[in-house]
């Protein structure tokens, strides 16, 4: 899945969101910059999700798949930076950005704060696909390409505030 357009990156992202749908409280989110761009991903999900889970249901109004376990995968967009508040107060075990370089750093970093467990037993993580170019090219390159050669794990430390207010 190198950087080539049409290389299957978006398909892999749509399929990756299925990894934890056996967990009833699992919530996944797949993002594109605009809803029209998102429609191709929804079409891919129709092909893959129905085949893997014949009784899963897609709600076209709310753009969400509901699985037999109770798990849900949402499809969303963030055309403007201010749209990030549509995700305020929400938690997603998995967040997938399709075409990450179309997003501003502020949008990506805000969504990282939404990437948190919805209950016990889920793996919380984020994935992204991208091609060169776009408004976010500079920050994506600075964050993921410049720091180290390919294949090098990049660890980031952060301070976490506990419920009692301590860090």
Pin down the residues of each PLM region.
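Phosphate/NTP-binding elements of NTP-utilizing enzymes
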Residues: 1-167
């Amino acid at each position: 899945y190198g950087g080539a357009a049409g290389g299957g990156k978006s398909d892999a992202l749509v399929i990756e969101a299925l990894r934890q749908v056996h967990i009833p409280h699992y919530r996944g989110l797949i993002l594109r910059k605009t809803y029209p761009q998102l429609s191709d991903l929804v079409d891919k999900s129709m092909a893959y999700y129905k085949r893997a889970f014949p009784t899963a249901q897609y709600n076209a109004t709310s753009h969400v798949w509901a699985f037999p376990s109770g798990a849900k995968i949402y499809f969303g967009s963030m055309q403007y930076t201010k749209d990030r508040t549509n995700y305020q107060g929400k938690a997603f075990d998995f967040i997938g950005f399709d075409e990450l370089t179309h997003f501003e750093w502020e949008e990506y970093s805000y969504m990282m704060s939404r990437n948190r467990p919805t209950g016990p037993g889920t793996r919380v993580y984020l994935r992204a696909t991208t091609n060169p170019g776009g408004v976010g090219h500079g920050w994506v390159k600075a964050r993921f390409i410049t720091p180290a050669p390919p294949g090098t794990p990049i660890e980031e430390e952060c301070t976490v505030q506990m419920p009692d207010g301590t860090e």
